[in-house]
């Protein structure tokens, strides 16, 4: 078992890429709407503090695409989030020019409604499309998704960080689901350490949390799985999504079945707004949640606690009898002497 000193050095080496400066591009009206519930910088800071994250990025606003391009020429940014209306410039033209000024900078489009979604698509100019629903936590999800994608290669190999793959092609749904998924992942990661470590050590260990990677079609899902199968913690997949250029209602079943065969220890869950897909999941023997269910978050939380290693530490005798249960590391340490004497196992 690695010593704390070795683990400390390993954790410090993770999450090398961090988003510190964000350029937000929107019309004054759109910016006013975004800040209707409070200043974005302050809301983001509160979200980071509540989740025990060590820093919050700074947001700089530009009212037009031209002004944003000038700012990109003046100083570096880590991420561009743009609304659809950026002055006289088309948003795809803006995204392309932004990447010409700062090579490799991620550009995320934040749309307002379904009509806007129909007008835009991901490509060379736009890396990802999200939908604003009034919940500022979508900004945290965007930030963490970009960071995870940039850090996953290094962190899986240097620190053995695990990977959770989300397969979902609806920007509207993943814009609602990802903030919940990230919040729950961070809360449950933190709960395992409650009372057992100093704040500094907790912040370090948060760097080693599972990376969330988003795929919006079968080709992306297969690529992510092929690359990170040795580090796979689990898969949450929609029942139907695009495959080979067209919608395949059986794509989720096919992908989950493949992962089930090749990575039998991975936690698997299907989600769908079609009730009949519950039977598909049951036949595969995997968890299922209804995307239209008001208790979706409760189902997600139960899945994570039961299947992703976030439940209690349970100590049992060789015959299966439970002799102890701990909710965090501190509780586990108290039980260890008794369990050693009883020769129990987790």
Regions found by a protein language model. Give the residues of each.
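Conserved phosphotransfer microenvironments
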Residues: 3-4, 33-41, 45, 54-56, ...
